[in-house]
Regions:
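Catalytic strand-loop segment that frames the active site of acyl-thioester-processing enzymes
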Residues: 32, 44-111, 125
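Catalytic-pocket segment enriched in acidic/His residues
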Residues: 99-174
Length: 175
């Protein structure tokens, strides 16, 4: 089977001097017959390109309720998770090479954001739709910090209206 991808840059945002630029894109995936299979939306940050006077990044309201989560799920990011994720085709050395990561102001190699996103998806699906992963049809996240390998994590889930939930994925040691 062959897939056709249509990738469109939809927005550029100036996060300010020293804060970078954000690029939003939308990728539509079609099968050979032209049927739309899924749409992926992504915001990519370029930390060195801000401060050019462009449109500022809009602030979205956080959907997380001001109450304790309905569920807290404990898990652990393995010590080699960043290396395993590299097998998907990630070639960015910041995820595997300590010297590269440190040169960019990080403590060391970190787990790719999409890998962390996958953890959230797996944990949330197992709790909200046990045995029925096909029921998860949309998921949105904003990454706020890096996640290092060999880290205990928690997924905090808030059940909202029918078919919707909010979440926060955190380092269990630092919150």
């Amino acid at each position: 089977m062959c897939f056709v991808y249509r990738d469109v840059l939809t927005d550029l945002f100036d996060r300010g001097e020293g804060r970078g630029m954000a690029v939003r894109s939308q990728v539509e995936v079609f099968d050979e017959g032209g049927t739309l299979l899924c749409t992926n939306r992504c915001t990519t940050l370029f930390p060195t390109l801000g401060g050019y006077g462009g449109q500022p990044m809009p602030r979205g309201a956080s959907p997380i309720p001001e109450r304790d989560p309905d569920l807290v799920i404990d898990d652990h990011i393995g010590a080699a998770q960043n290396l395993l994720y590299r097998l998907t085709g990630d070639t960015n050395l910041v995820h595997v090479d300590r010297d590269v990561a440190v040169s960019r102001g990080l403590d060391g190699p970190f787990v790719h954001d999409l890998c962390a996103y996958g953890y959230v998806c797996r944990l949330a699906t197992a709790q909200l739709f046990p045995g029925h992963p096909e029921k998860l049809t949309r998921m949105f996240a904003a990454m706020k910090t890096v996640l290092y390998p060999d880290t205990p994590v928690q997924l905090h889930l808030w059940k909202l209206e029918e078919g919707k939930a909010a979440f926060r994925f955190v380092n269990a040691q630092t919150g």
